[in-house]
From Swiss-Prot:
PANTHER family: D-AMINOACYL-TRNA DEACYLASE 1, D-TYROSYL-TRNA TYR DEACYLASE. The lineage of its organism: Bacteria, Pseudomonadati, Pseudomonadota, Betaproteobacteria, Burkholderiales. Pfam families: Tyr_Deacylase. It is an enzyme of class 3 (hydrolase). It comes from the Bacteria. One of its GO terms (cellular component) is cytoplasm. This is D-aminoacyl-tRNA deacylase.
Amino acid sequence: MIALIQRVKRADVRVGDRTTGEIGAGLLALVCAERGDNEAAADKLLAKLLGYRVFSDAAGKMNLPVSNIDGAGGAGGLLLVSQFTLAADTNSGLRPSFTPAAPPDEGARLFDYFVAAARERHPVVETGEFGADMQVSLVNDGPVTFWLQVRP
């Protein structure tokens, strides 16, 4: 599974004229299931995402996870947005191949599992809508962006 995470001041996702999720300071994670991924891969990616230290401590070093963005136990928001294009094969030609991405039904199942697991482990979780045409807005803080990928 893949997550492209961005440290944000704020972020939101809309489907048409409806806001499906929005957060203040925290992480926006674009999430993609690849062929062969399973719940174990989702759990491993979620643990990495929740523990990844990308927020600054009092000394200005990236040393704090999203569960403690202020150094005093305050949790930041987590906005999870499905994005199958992260699995694109861009090695040949001028058109990406999405063969490496999980099929839509499996991708939806794993994304739903990932969201449910995140909600069990983190207090502020918002989402986009799987398979929808979404508009994502964010104010990137830094900018700080990381590619996280785990294999089953």
